[in-house]
Amino acid sequence: MGKTQPLPILITGGGRRIGLALAWHFINQKQPVIVSYRTHYPAIDGLINAGAQCIQADFSTNDGVMAFADEVLKSTHGLRAILHNASAWMAEKPGAPLADVLACMMQIHVNTPYLLNHALERLLRGHGHAASDIIHFTDYVVERGSDKHIAYAASKAALDNMTRSFARKLAPEVKVNSIAPSLILFNEHDDAEYRQQALNKSLMKTAPGEKEVIDLVDYLLTSCFVTGRSFPLDGGRHLR
């Protein structure tokens, strides 16, 4: 008899940075992946050529979220995990209507994972005890707050709370946890002064890169016991 094909891992926002690194990590492990992307970066073509299923999605509306869910439901009979990595970053600033800023942040960080978790629940169930996972990517600011990104921080805090609610709802078949990173890697355009200021905010004074996230994701996927928890990746920043 042939070997059973592993169930795919769904990664939202998989076209760049941490989402892209996670997608390649699983591909290199011969783990099928489904990736959502908003903008067709060149990296998407690389994922497709490597065998990933890449679905363009517009999470700015609930209809867009549900259209993406329908595509996933049509493409697979089950999921190994959902990694909610899709994110947006908006600040309260002159000219930006405050209600629009809040609505945008809540849409991507709360409505989207909320709707997808419900819509795809049946794909996660039925595979055994602690056999499936949901991982929410939140943020360090959930703990501290942010005077410049109030809506962003509030939306990530709501996602953090949903981690515990969905853990209660889906146990013991599905484990639900969150990862709360601070600085993981820089953008290419970040100058030396900014980089040093950012590094000085943590005790470890380094940007560890995607591998730190990948290692934690691997731990959560292999655990058969951990659920309903948030895991900070902040280099001791809370102690500064």
Swiss-Prot record:
Entry keyword Cytoplasm: no
Residues annotated as the enzyme's active site: 152 (proton acceptor)
Gene name in the database record: folM
Record EC number: 1.5.1.50, 1.5.1.3
Keywords: NADP, One-carbon metabolism, Oxidoreductase
SUPFAM superfamilies, sorted: NAD(P)-binding Rossmann-fold domains (SSF51735)
Activity-regulation annotation: Inhibited by methotrexate.
Gene Ontology molecular function: dihydrofolate reductase activity; dihydromonapterin reductase activity; identical protein binding
GO BP terms in the entry: 10-formyltetrahydrofolate biosynthetic process; folic acid biosynthetic process; one-carbon metabolic process; protein homotetramerization; pteridine-containing compound biosynthetic process
Xref: Pfam families: adh_short_C2
NCBIfam families: PRK06483.1
Function comment: Catalyzes the reduction of dihydromonapterin to tetrahydromonapterin. Also has lower activity with dihydrofolate.
pH-activity dependence text: Optimum pH is 4.7.
Protein name in the entry: Dihydromonapterin reductase
Family designation: Belongs to the short-chain dehydrogenases/reductases (SDR) family. FolM subfamily.
Domain of life the protein comes from: Bacteria
